[in-house]
Amino acid sequence: MNRVNDPLIFIRDIKPGLKNLNVVFIVLEIGRVTKTKDGHEVRSCKVADKTGSITISVWDEIGGLIQPGDIIRLTRGYASMWKGCLTLYTGRGGELQKIGEFCMVYSEVPNFSEPNPDYRGQQNKGAQSEQKNNSMNSNMGTGTFGPVGNGVHTGPESREHQFSHAGRSNGRGLINPQLQGTASNQTVMTTISNGRDPRRAFKR
């Protein structure tokens, strides 16, 4: 069975324990290098597609080759929780293949790797809760992110990449405080916090 031809999965559909994942994403940030006890280098990279962002853990020399703006196809990856955060891994036999640069529609929000106490509750309640959550969030993906941000970039820090603002779209407590924050070391968050007033104006 050739898993390279398996269907792609969106970042929003990644859940802990899923294996043989095929995902296409754009690299947004490369984290600092950490070394394991046995000498391996590990990088945590923030990646995104049109449905949201997630952290991927990349080991050794491959991590040194990845650059922000690279569009990459992951084959045979898997997802797991690490320190309470959903993380994507290449896995055994997994591959990262660069298929382009820069030109990809993506959304940084929601960040599925942020610690989310609600997710632990959903995990314990089982599939019924997941289905209820999915039906409530069914217009989120491209439908909610596009119109809420309306394609309007606010502030001088706007990037050429299309990304939008989720606001309170998923009800997670940790995303809203970040949208209201104005930390100087988070230029993207500055852009998002400036987007709050125009959204109110569009609703009127």
Swiss-Prot record:
Asked whether the UniProt record includes Transmembrane helix among its keywords, one would answer no
Which residue spans adopt a coiled-coil conformation according to this UniProt entry?
Answer: none
Write out the annotated subcellular location.
Answer: Nucleus
| Record flagged with keyword DNA repair | yes
Q: Ranges of Polar residues compositional bias?
A: 121-142, 177-187
GO cellular component terms? chromosome, telomeric region; cytosol; nucleoplasm; nucleus; site of double-strand break; SOSS complex
Keyword annotations for this protein?
A: DNA damage, DNA repair, DNA-binding, Nucleus
Primary role: Component of the SOSS complex, a multiprotein complex that functions downstream of the MRN complex to promote DNA repair and G2/M checkpoint. In the SOSS complex, acts as a sensor of single-stranded DNA that binds to single-stranded DNA, in particular to polypyrimidines. The SOSS complex associates with DNA lesions and influences diverse endpoints in the cellular DNA damage response including cell-cycle checkpoint activation, recombinational repair and maintenance of genomic stability.
Q: What's the protein here called? A: SOSS complex subunit B2
> What gene name is listed for this protein?
NABP1
